[in-house]
């Protein structure tokens, strides 16, 4: 009787033991996955607190498993959708996350790793020293200014050699070629392509976009760029980089065999057609794509006949749409809608779009997520965005960043130095660093960055061949003189401004806010960027002198106000004195006032009256009489016709000459002999000095410059200036022979 009961009891005990053991193993394995152990809990299994702890751990583990399952199901559904590649919904409904750019090597990434965060350690980059190609369409003065900020942001982060390809009009070509030539950034190549030669390719397309015909030029890149160029990153000028562009270049490796274009999804509802009533956009896949940042696989595009394909697409859609609203972007999107397999969707942080109606804030959650910022609104920095202040500060960082600091070498990457860089290096090596005047000599050969036509310039010289440009230079502390000069001189002006990057932006804001300056399109502003410890006054003057388009120039200083009507008077004098066929320098007599507020004389008679009353003085009569004494002011008071004067030592008048006159000698920097040496060379070239009887200019008071303070306080400064004078005399004698000996004699007799 007891045997059957004893057997059942044994079975029950074994079963209970098995259940307990199974439960124990389950908990042990489950918690070991998270790096935890339940050995301690097992020892305290009798404790109520331990049991509560185990229950909480189990509940937490269940929630984690459920969340992992949910993420796996989400990834599975997305991968199935990608594999199917439906015609539209695949692009319109995707989340703006990094998974949009997942390659085969990323299959093992978890959902959290593939969320909208940039994983720096996992980001692919280009090969070390691989040459990266960047293309940009740039036309006009404003775009040329914008592209500099783009280039700065790229150079700041880059670790690879770069080759920039610019599609430019004549204006941008002149500005950017001068800028890059004077910038001398190592491991950077620049090529220019004439946009005028490409206009016929796209001029037949009606376009309502504010960029005009240049907004369609990106369609022609397969034709414009060299045939041996296989890949290129194409950027708008209103782009700012916040990371190394090599990371973007590396995405080319993720392209499938069929993909030819890499784009970021448009972050507004424009292509959904619901922004306003009766809004009819061009066809696009879902939200469409933004063409501010493009990866173009040129080799594949040429092979598939891209030029013919985009033309057919444009012709077909224009039959119903009549014109483009977003320039090339409309045509790119219409093409992609018909050929979705050709596009590789980039993560949205490669083109965070700050335009009206944008939803770009869904694209990032942290600063580290930002890689490229796109100011694709006509409002630019004034666009509405809840984080716009942060983006604006990032943009301003590069806007005002000292471009000289970007001349750093790429260590480990061999590069061929430019001819300018080689010449500069050789000249530096020839200098003696122990020379007391080493800094002065080094300043003479230093190559400063130059940005020509910083603001819009539109002027065509008069047809009579007598047109004349006022030429001057200034720094930030003379900026207040510009409006007054523009009121006194209605003709063209060429101004060279010696400024830092940050000061150039202050000047830009000042000029754009001034009613006087912003309405003058015949004033050329040329920025010479600061570098070194001296003011390279003659180098800055030469920049202004070289960039005039009239046959004659009036060489003056910015703290002088010309008499009213001087522009017309000088043009008449040019004809009267036959300057086209003779070598003459017309002298404009200089006066000065010590009053900041002056009732400016409207005639010679008024000026003579003020001179007699002591309101005006002949210029520097009490400080540097020799500078203008040869003008012969006593004779000028009664003169009614032009009269000739002879050169004398230290004579430095302000003159009108032909544009092909000798340039200023750039060895003279800061204060002293910068104009004297120029007049001396004019005399050596046998220019006649002719004083005009009814012309005058008045010097306005200002605080002493920093350089004149150094001249007065530093014996070393004065010694070096004397040394430079002697060397100039020697060079003048070698250049002009025995006729130049009179200058050395005159100097010794002083």
Swiss-Prot record:
Membrane topology: Single-pass type II membrane protein
Group of enzyme by EC: transferase
Reactions accelerated catalytically: 3-O-[beta-D-GlcA-(1->3)-beta-D-Xyl-(1->4)-Rib-ol-P-Rib-ol-P-3-beta-D-GalNAc-(1->3)-beta-D-GlcNAc-(1->4)-(O-6-P-alpha-D-Man)]-Thr-[protein] + UDP-alpha-D-xylose = 3-O-[alpha-D-Xyl-(1->3)-beta-D-GlcA-(1->4)-beta-D-Xyl-(1->4)-Rib-ol-P-Rib-ol-P-3-beta-D-GalNAc-(1->3)-beta-D-GlcNAc-(1->4)-(O-6-P-alpha-D-Man)]-Thr-[protein] + UDP + H(+); 3-O-{(1->[3)-alpha-D-Xyl-(1->3)-beta-D-GlcA-(1->](n)-4)-beta-D-Xyl-(1->4)-Rib-ol-P-Rib-ol-P-3-beta-D-GalNAc-(1->3)-beta-D-GlcNAc-(1->4)-O-6-P-alpha-D-Man}-L-Thr-[protein] + UDP-alpha-D-glucuronate = 3-O-{beta-D-GlcA-(1->[3)-alpha-D-Xyl-(1->3)-beta-D-GlcA-(1->](n)-4)-beta-D-Xyl-(1->4)-Rib-ol-P-Rib-ol-P-3-beta-D-GalNAc-(1->3)-beta-D-GlcNAc-(1->4)-O-6-P-alpha-D-Man}-L-Thr-[protein] + UDP + H(+); 3-O-{beta-D-GlcA-(1->[3)-alpha-D-Xyl-(1->3)-beta-D-GlcA-(1->](n)-4)-beta-D-Xyl-(1->4)-Rib-ol-P-Rib-ol-P-3-beta-D-GalNAc-(1->3)-beta-D-GlcNAc-(1->4)-O-6-P-alpha-D-Man}-L-Thr-[protein] + UDP-alpha-D-xylose = 3-O-{(1->[3)-alpha-D-Xyl-(1->3)-beta-D-GlcA-(1->](n+1)-4)-beta-D-Xyl-(1->4)-Rib-ol-P-Rib-ol-P-3-beta-D-GalNAc-(1->3)-beta-D-GlcNAc-(1->4)-O-6-P-alpha-D-Man}-L-Thr-[protein] + UDP + H(+)
InterPro entries: Glyco_trans_8 (IPR002495), Nucleotide-diphossugar_trans (IPR029044), Xyl/GlcA_transferase (IPR051292)
TM segment ranges: 11-31
GO cellular component entries: Golgi apparatus; Golgi membrane
Location in the cell: Golgi apparatus membrane
Keyword tags: Glycoprotein, Glycosyltransferase, Golgi apparatus, Manganese, Membrane, Metal-binding, Multifunctional enzyme, Signal-anchor, Transferase, Transmembrane, Transmembrane helix
Keyword Thylakoid assigned: no
Cytoplasmic face residues: 1-10
Documented EC number(s): 2.4.-.-, 2.4.2.-, 2.4.1.-
Pathway in which this enzyme or protein is active: Protein modification; protein glycosylation
Protein name: Xylosyl- and glucuronyltransferase LARGE2s
Organism: Danio rerio (Zebrafish)
Lineage, uppermost ranks: Eukaryota, Metazoa, Chordata, Craniata, Vertebrata
